[in-house]
């Protein structure tokens, strides 16, 4: 209150739009002013267009800056039509012409978007399409492998040299070795794996190639095969020699690209091969990539998932044998019959791994003795073959095999094994002639087999044959079976299985061996569009966090430092809130080591604020900060350090989250919530329809932290007809007080951006309803089509509190300046008409004066209440008010300490 202040009245208090002026003893209005750290208040800086023209005069929904791995600063603006545009010039530079090129196409009915950054990748969500991701430039690759084979390259290679660490560090002495890399026809290539889709890979060469050769590239296509890149340009070529210099290999983004699994990694795979063998000393020290904006995909984490169960059907006994996925008996499956191996999986798959362990399907066994194989005529009993090395079983011979015998005198025949031990093979009586210590050759050959793979599609079984690859040679060795994604697969509870799952089956065209037992692991794939449109996103503890509109109260916590992996044990779906209400998640806020989640407010119960804690997906838990308050949209919050609190007004370390709800402006410390907007309560008073925030326009409000002035700036869409923000508030954090702004251009969103030049590291920019982006806190005018003066005024209410005020003179002190004036005016006893208006200079009287004093007469002897309004509304000028005093007829201060 005024009477308890020092003799001079300070202006650092706050405006009050709720209390009747006659009841106030302090400020009622404080418009377009900012508190100064050293005392006093100064008119806010102006705002100026970042670009000179706009191709579409529509509202800017949101504004955000993205800094990629290469340090490139990119300012993006989201327009009302849903498109996203990239600034041609980074702040503070201005652009002649339009703001910048379109980065993401328009789509109707988007909300104010959310954007976050994880490991240099941008994540974007606007509520009307899937989440989008963008790697920017100079993003590190996730895999770099060199393959030099001697036979046909399998779909999932098992050999190769991994140079990922060498090309992703800063050392030039650690390199990827491409020495004498040969052609693809000779089974040579190098492979690059990226987390997000790439359209350019830049290689830094240490030892360059000088041999004439060209480069070709392939990507993994949705049909389950490699496809040639379109529009490939080789920036590493020098004088006809690829890899002859450092440079970028670029190509056109294919629309049919999907992730792939190579060398134990799952991601986007790019295979490169040369047309001729290159030099014997060629090496690469770094590989980085660039990509474009692409829809986010849920990429498999690379950990094979076990099959749920298997059922083996045998025609000879007309029944199914049930097994767990880790031990499946496929012995004696007959060729050409209806013997099938069925297996189920919770997720659709594009491949499965058959692990044969020590019990493969034996398709070939051969030995040649060294004068140590003998043939025994068993008389009336079984004949048999003996081998002194006693390795028949370990070499793959077993009962039931047809064995071809050669290199003998009398036994060059084909026999069928009845029983096999380590040193004997028994056959039917009368087949063998006695021979001793021969160097005979015994061969069992069942090679050349294939198997048929089918998938359940709802109406029946559908064969998968195109691009089917079997690296197991019909389960004779461990390996992958891969195929294109079966888009028509349907789930079923196969043959009474308790699991509703996808079902696949395969059969062999040759009889399997007697003791074949396998396990099956699967290669799943996922469709992120099953979750609906991407509504908002965030990051937490190095993980991407997603919210969708299909399951609004559920969030997806992704794999650690994987931008696009939301499956496997290191990821987790998690329900926020406390009671299952389907309120949409609108904002994620990192708060210390925790994650604060805001949901929308709707119905009688309102919204919810959840605090998620934990070190990983296994230790995660939640607590409820509020089960009634929520947030209006994803651009209506700010996290601020060093906030004074009522319990500790001098605190310099308190962290607070400021946010707008339909109930007002609040701040939370993660434990409780405090409403701070009471002095501006008319904007949240539903009985005041002319001033209250407008229902149905919640997405138009905004809140952000002004790092220059250490204040919270707010835009509200109020009244009955406004369609964009039309009221702007300022919360002065240091004093916990309020002010208002009147803006020459309707700012609809705000962002702090890192400056590309100049002495100020952080600048403030805002998007406006006219389609322009404005720099804030700059100059003295609001410069749009024409300059508009910053109309700054402060109104001080002085109440006698039951006493008459005997004030004859208003003494005002201003910071001295080279030009400018201040206009005081007075109103008495609650009258809203100001009078005694006069204009006084703020320029210096005497050289080196630091402030200017002006005395204004008060033409009223005694009064109950005085309203003093100090105004400045001149283009090209600012006003800096220090303090004021009221003097009586004797020149003494009316207010005593």
Model-derived segments and spans:
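Small/polar beta-strand repeat architecture
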Residues: 103-109, 221-267, 272-309, 313, ...
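Exposed low-complexity, polar/acidic, P/S/T/G-rich flexible segments that act as propeptides
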Residues: 139-151, 274-308, 445, 508-533, ...
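N-terminal beta-propeller domains
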Residues: 1-97, 131, 139, 162-165, ...
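Surface-exposed loop and turn segments in beta-propeller and other repeat-based domains
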Residues: 567-579, 625, 680-695
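Hydrophobic or amphipathic alpha-helical targeting/insertion segments
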Residues: 112-138
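A short beta-strand element within beta-rich, extracytoplasmic domains
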Residues: 195-209, 217, 347-368, 447, ...
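Beta-sheet repeat architectures centered on beta-propellers
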Residues: 1-92, 97-99, 105-121, 347-349, ...
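Autoprocessing Asn-cyclization modules and mimics
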Residues: 138-197, 299-435
């Amino acid at each position: 209150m005024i009477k308890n202040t020092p003799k001079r009245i300070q202006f650092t208090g706050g405006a009050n739009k709720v209390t009747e002026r006659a009841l106030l003893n302090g400020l009622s209005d404080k418009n377009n002013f900012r508190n100064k750290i050293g005392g006093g208040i100064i008119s806010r800086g102006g705002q100026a267009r970042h670009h000179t023209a706009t191709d579409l005069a529509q509202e800017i929904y949101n504004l955000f800056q993205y800094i990629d791995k290469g340090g490139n600063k990119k300012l993006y603006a989201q327009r009302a039509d849903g498109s996203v545009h990239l600034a041609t010039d980074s702040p503070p530079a201005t652009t002649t012409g339009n703001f910048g090129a379109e980065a993401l196409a328009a789509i109707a009915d988007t909300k104010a978007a959310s954007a976050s950054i994880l490991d240099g990748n941008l994540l974007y969500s606007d509520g009307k399409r899937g989440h989008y991701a963008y790697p920017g430039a100079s993003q590190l690759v996730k895999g770099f492998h060199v393959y030099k084979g001697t036979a046909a390259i399998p779909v999932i290679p098992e050999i190769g040299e991994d140079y990922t660490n060498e090309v992703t560090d800063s050392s030039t002495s650690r390199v990827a070795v491409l020495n004498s890399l040969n052609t693809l026809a000779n089974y040579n290539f190098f492979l690059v794996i990226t987390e997000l889709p790439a359209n350019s890979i830049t290689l830094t060469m240490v030892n360059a190639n000088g041999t004439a050769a060209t480069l070709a590239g392939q990507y993994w296509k949705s049909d389950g095969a490699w496809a040639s890149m379109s529009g490939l340009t080789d920036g590493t070529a020098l004088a006809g020699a690829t890899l002859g210099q450092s440079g970028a290999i670029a190509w056109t983004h294919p629309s049919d690209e999907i992730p792939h699994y190579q060398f134990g990694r799952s991601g986007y795979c790019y295979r490169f091969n040369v047309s001729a063998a290159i030099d014997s000393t060629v090496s690469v020290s770094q590989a980085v990539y660039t990509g474009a904006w692409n829809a986010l995909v849920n990429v498999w984490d690379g950990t094979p998932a076990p099959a749920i169960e298997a059922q083996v059907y045998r025609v000879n006994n007309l029944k199914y044998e049930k097994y767990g996925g880790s031990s499946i008996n496929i012995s004696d499956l007959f060729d050409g019959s209806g013997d099938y191996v069925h297996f189920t999986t919770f997720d659709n798959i594009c491949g499965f791994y058959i692990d044969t362990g020590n019990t493969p399907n034996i398709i070939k066994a051969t030995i040649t003795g060294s004068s140590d194989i003998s043939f025994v005529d068993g008389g009336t009993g079984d004949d048999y073959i003996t081998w002194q090395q006693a390795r028949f079983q370990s070499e793959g011979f077993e009962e039931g095999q047809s064995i071809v015998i050669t290199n003998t005198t009398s036994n060059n025949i084909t026999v069928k094994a009845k029983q096999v031990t380590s040193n004997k093979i028994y056959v039917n009586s009368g087949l063998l002639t006695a021979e001793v210590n021969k160097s005979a050759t015994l061969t069992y050959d069942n090679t050349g087999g294939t198997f048929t793979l089918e998938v359940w599609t709802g109406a029946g079984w559908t064969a998968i044959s195109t691009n089917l690859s079997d690296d197991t040679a019909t389960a004779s060795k461990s390996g992958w079976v891969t195929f294109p994604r079966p888009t028509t697969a349907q789930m079923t509870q196969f043959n009474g299985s308790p699991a509703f799952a996808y079902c696949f089956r395969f059969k062999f065209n040759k009889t399997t061996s007697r003791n074949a037992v396998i396990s099956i692991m699967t290669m799943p794939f996922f469709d992120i569009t099953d979750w609906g449109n991407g509504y908002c996103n965030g990051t937490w503890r190095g993980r991407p966090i997603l919210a969708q509109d299909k399951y609004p109260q559920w969030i997806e916590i992704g794999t650690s430092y994987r931008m696009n992996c939301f499956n496997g044990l290191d990821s987790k779906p998690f329900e926020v809130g406390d009671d299952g209400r389907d309120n949409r998640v609108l904002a994620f806020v990192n708060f210390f080591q925790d994650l604060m989640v805001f949901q929308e407010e709707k119905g009688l119960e309102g919204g919810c604020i959840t605090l998620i804690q934990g070190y990983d997906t296994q230790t995660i838990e939640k607590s409820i900060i509020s089960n009634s308050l929520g947030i209006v949209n994803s651009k209506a919050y700010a996290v601020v350090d060093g906030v004074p609190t009522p319990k500790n007004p001098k605190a310099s370390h308190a962290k607070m989250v400021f946010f707008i709800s339909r109930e007002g402006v609040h701040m939370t410390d993660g434990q409780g919530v405090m409403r701070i907007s009471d002095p501006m309560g008319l904007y949240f008073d539903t009985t005041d329809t002319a001033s209250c925030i407008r229902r149905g326009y919640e997405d138009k409000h905004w809140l952000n932290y002004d790092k220059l002035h250490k204040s919270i700036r707010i835009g509200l869409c109020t009244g009955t007809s406004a369609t964009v923000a039309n009221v702007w508030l300022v919360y002065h954090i240091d004093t916990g007080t309020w002010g208002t702004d009147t803006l020459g251009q309707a700012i609809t969103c705000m962002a702090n951006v890192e400056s590309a030049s100049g002495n100020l590291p952080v600048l403030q920019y805002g998007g406006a309803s006219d389609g322009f982006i404005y720099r804030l806190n700059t100059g003295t005018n609001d410069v749009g089509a024409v300059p508009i003066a910053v109309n700054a005024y402060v109104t001080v209410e002085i109440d006698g509190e039951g006493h008459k005020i005997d004030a004859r003179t208003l003494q005002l002190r201003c910071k001295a300046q080279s030009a400018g004036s201040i206009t005081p005016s007075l109103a008495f006893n609650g009258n809203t008409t100001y009078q005694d208006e006069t204009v006084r200079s703020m320029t210096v009287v005497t050289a080196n004066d630091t402030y200017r004093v002006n005395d204004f007469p008060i033409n009223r002897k005694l009064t109950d209440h005085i309203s003093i309004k100090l105004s400045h509304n001149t283009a090209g000028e600012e006003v800096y008010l220090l303090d004021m005093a009221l003097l009586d007829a004797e020149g003494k201060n009316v207010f005593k300490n």
